[in-house]
Amino acid sequence: MKKNSIETSLTTQSLVIKSIWSYALPSTARLWSSVLEKMPRNIYTFSIRYLGNCLPNRSNTHRWGAAVSGLCSFCPNRQTLGHVIGGCKISLEEKRFNWRHNSILLSLARATKALPFVTVYCDIEECQEFLSPSIISGDSFRPNMIVVREKEIFVIELTVGFEPNMQKNALRKQQRYKPLIDSLSKTQSVHFLNLSVGAAGIISNDAANIFNWMKNLGFSQKESEYLIRKTINICIRTTYYLFCRRDKPWETPKLLSW
């Protein structure tokens, strides 16, 4: 079989699963499974169908003969799974994907803020309870969150997207923030977490230092696992809602938090 035929088959059948095998962080697999098992039945079923790329987005329903067109409701591109949950430029402009991203970020920031002797700088447009990271990083760079504790600086950059793009997203962020990390490291001890997460809650192996990062910050092992499970939970639930609204007008909900 030619390479193009193989890629076409993977695109329509198992590209998500193949990406998880290649890029997922093994040490968080147990946590992901435990979260998924406790999901409401509708979200659990959605997640399983997501993994097999057999959800009723238009490119699929058109291929199944159940829709006249396979195009997106908002733009002239095909409404593939990846397009719905992270690729549509109109959805991006409407800040649909920001809502998912910032819901996760808010959870991480609030948990970190509860630690002793830390100052949290976090870039969340909908929330005014944190100082801007640019106070530390300057205007040229603005990572999602910076935490200062004495002479240590903890930097986290969160990216959420389609699983086949996890590694590419992580590499892009690594290159983007390297100058900042190098600059801060001249005077401080810097810990950088490049947290690339798939839309189904899969954590990329580029975040292999996640447990050490949290431990150094002051979280216990139990607290770290809870926070990772919560990250996965929020990611799955928000992706489910984004998919349900794929053909509908968007009114940004409050950030998902508990």
Identify the residue ranges that each predicted region occupies.
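Active-site metal-binding core of divalent-cation-utilizing nuclease and nuclease-like domains
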Residues: 62-68, 107, 111-157, 171
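Short Cys/His-based metal-binding microdomains
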Residues: 63-111
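Domain-level recognition of nuclease-like catalytic cores that cleave nucleotide substrates
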Residues: 191-258
